[in-house]
């Protein structure tokens, strides 16, 4: 109570008694009776990929064409002019992880953005933030693909899909690691492994460079995923 908060160059300089050496053009805000909080970080957001108000032209959050679409990146769907960004900022959200939707077992890469005005998503990207990988279990994938008459259509189908994808990713990572370990002379005789964008993302998870963000409903499903 009855304290002053002094900012300079976007950082908190002092809390308590106001400094006496601030410049004459310093902006003074009377916030008596209000609250000052740190910026809120939203770790699960679809702003920009599902703008509001929603229209089909800008609804780009789910690549619902296959259960495994780890090759897609949410940042390539972000519409920086989504009016929702401004409303979120008014509510105190200053950074957010933008994720694909939850239709697929593996929905694709998520990206961390600063909630700043920008013409492009590149101008919003949070420096050095790791990518996330959106995954979903339970009702969503089995509903989406069960209705299409394809798999998965059950929870056991979901689990089988995860296992198969991680097995492929492990083999892919091992194959590339084996090639990279070869000497220059040995590489002349070896066949360079093909690059696969889907498996490259999954291998990034196995290497610890990409962080899983899992959409789950039930505790037992969460335990199943931990077992995998």
Regions found by a protein language model. Give the residues of each.
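Glycine-rich nucleotide phosphate-binding loop and flanking beta-alpha elements
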Residues: 13, 19-20, 47, 104, ...
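Polyanionic/metal-chelating signatures
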Residues: 84, 89-223
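Glycine-rich loops and low-complexity Gly/Arg-rich segments
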Residues: 12-14, 53-55, 65-67, 120-124, ...
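A short, polar/charged loop/turn motif at coil->beta-strand junctions and beta-hairpin connectors
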Residues: 22-23, 66-68, 206-208
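Conserved small/polar residues in nucleotide/adenosyl-binding loops
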Residues: 226-228
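Metal-associated gating/positioning segment near the N- to mid-region
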Residues: 31-100, 105
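Histidine-rich, glycine-flanked metal-binding segment
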Residues: 1-37, 54
């Amino acid at each position: 109570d009855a304290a002053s908060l002094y900012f300079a160059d976007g950082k908190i300089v002092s809390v308590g008694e106001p400094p006496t050496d601030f410049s004459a053009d310093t902006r003074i805000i009377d916030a008596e009776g209000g609250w000052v909080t740190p910026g809120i970080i939203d770790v699960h957001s679809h702003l920009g990929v599902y703008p509001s108000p929603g229209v089909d032209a800008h609804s780009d959050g789910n690549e619902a064409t296959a259960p495994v679409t780890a090759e897609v990146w949410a940042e390539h769907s972000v519409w920086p002019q989504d009016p929702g960004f401004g409303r979120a900022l008014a509510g105190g959200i200053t950074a957010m992880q933008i994720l694909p939707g939850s239709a697929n077992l593996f929905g694709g890469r998520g990206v961390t953005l600063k909630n700043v005005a920008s013409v492009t998503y590149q101008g919003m990207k949070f420096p050095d933030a790791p990518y996330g990988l959106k995954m979903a279990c339970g009702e969503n994938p089995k509903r989406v693909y069960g209705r299409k008459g394809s798999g998965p259509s059950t929870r056991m189908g979901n689990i089988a899909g995860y296992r198969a994808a991680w097995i492929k990713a492990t083999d892919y990572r091992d194959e590339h690691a084996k090639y990279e370990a070869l000497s220059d002379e040995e590489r002349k005789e070896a066949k360079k492994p093909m690059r696969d964008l889907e498996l490259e993302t999954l291998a990034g998870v196995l290497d610890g460079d990409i962080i899983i963000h899992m959409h789950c409903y039930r505790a037992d499903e969460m335990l199943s995923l931990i077992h995998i």
